[in-house]
């Protein structure tokens, strides 16, 4: 029996799965499931957004750190036409928005330049987890 007739080992299957997922993530123009990405790809919307209530996806793609883009897929909240993010401590993207509030958000294939503004510290705002900071996303032109 030759080596080429042996079934692949479990570790080989896992390596192929991880590699395949990484290749998919690299080609999607942003984050992929739980894997962070780089610069978001899509149509950049230059008109300011006054009302974010059109956002009805489960997740938003958030691009941080304009000098070396880092993007993640995350939950969001729309309240009274405003878009809010509530990062947990220890998230890399949370550190990045503290350093530079300029971000871009993507819903579908549309990208909106924005900046984030801290509006609440843990426990200050009703309707958000008590251990989270709360940021409002404000539209900006690039």
Question: Each predicted region: which residue ranges?
Answer:
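Bacterial N-terminal signal peptides that target proteins for export
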Residues: 3-16
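Short beta-strand segments
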Residues: 55-89, 115-117
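Post-signal peptide N-terminal segment of mature Sec-exported envelope proteins
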Residues: 37-58
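Short, structured beta-strand-loop surface elements
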Residues: 46-49, 68-70, 90-142
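Juxtamembrane/interfacial segments flanking transmembrane helices
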Residues: 31-34
């Amino acid at each position: 029996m030759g080596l080429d007739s042996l079934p692949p080992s479990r570790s080989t299957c896992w390596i192929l799965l991880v590699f395949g997922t990484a290749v998919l993530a690299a080609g999607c123009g942003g984050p992929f499931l739980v894997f962070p990405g780089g610069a978001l790809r899509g149509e950049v919307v230059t008109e300011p957004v006054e009302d974010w209530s059109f956002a009805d996806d489960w997740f938003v793609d958030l691009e941080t750190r304009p000098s070396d883009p880092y993007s993640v897929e995350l939950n969001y909240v729309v309240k009274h036409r405003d878009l809010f993010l509530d990062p947990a401590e220890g998230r890399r993207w949370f550190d990045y928005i503290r350093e530079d509030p300029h971000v871009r958000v993507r819903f579908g294939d549309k990208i909106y330049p924005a900046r984030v503004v801290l509006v609440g510290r843990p426990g200050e705002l009703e309707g958000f987890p008590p251990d989270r900071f709360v940021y409002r996303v404000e539209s900006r032109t690039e």
